[in-house]
Amino acid sequence: MKKVLFAVGCAGLFLGSAAFADEAAKPYVGYWAVNLNGGAGWMGIEQADCGALSGSILWGGGSPLKYEKVNVENGALVLTRTLTSKKDGKEEKKTEKITAKADSGQLAMTKVVVEQDGKETGKSEYKGNKIKPLPAKPDLAKVKFGEPIKLFEKGLDGWVAMNPKAFNGWSMKDGILSNRVLDENGKNKHGTNLRTVATTFEDFNLKTEACMAKGGNSGIYLRGIYEIQMADTFGKGVDCHNMGALYGRVTPLVAAEKAAGEWQTVDITLCDRHVTVILNGKKIIDNQPAVGVTGGAITCDEFVPGPIYLQGDHTNVDYRNMVLTPIIK
């Protein structure tokens, strides 16, 4: 007989099943770093007090996707969500199914699409590992800093294109790092991202100024894995995809952005997997946990040093006065 724990609402679980629910789900609850065979992924599984499960997965880019059903079946974690598309004018629904098996903190994951006739297609396999629990929120008043590093002091000599085959719209003039990827008709040339030559940054404070183009979209990746969104979102409400957000993870407390074309001050602190962001003098993220990498990360490993990288494949953007001050541990 199959033993199945379904992620239903708490009201749908009997008290007698709670102990089994906790035991069956225990190996999976928490955060997982997922290697997407060259890309950086993440999975988060949470369990309510009643035992009900919920889960989301980051598939390399964008934001984590929430799954409609999460259950444990014969010791394996199963997540499903409905995929809706149109074919010949008719709505067609398929099911994306993820099956994962945990063993001593390691994860073997299989992804398939279940067609309407029940046939499984598009099989892919991935590996992952359990992420260490988040440390306590750091007391930033007690943090010690080293000597500041002016990241633009050597011009472009301190930076390298991340995709040498892509269009490179980055240039440096009068201390301003500019990215120009739109032609005279506004068409995107699909430029390259840019990163520091140095890849040894750990925890730090990063200060810079950014000037967003109308409708602009860029990002500052801390250690190459956590994106602080840079975007023209002036006049919009707070959202985890707007200016200053930890992309797809943490929504700003207030909307503090300026209009496109204005220089904006950005002050970011990354310490013990917690992020603080001060935008234009207003604290919009206050020492909040980074529970996992964000879309576009260069690795799913949150415990290795990395570079600062700037997103350059979307729109035009300017940066100036970028200074990184390392935290001394």
Name each region found by the language model.
Residues 22-329:
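Carbohydrate-interacting regions of secretory-pathway proteins
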Residues 17-21:
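Sec/Tat signal peptide C-region and signal peptidase I cleavage site
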Residues 7-16:
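Bacterial N-terminal signal peptides
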Residues 1-4:
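Positively charged n-region of N-terminal signal peptides that target proteins for export
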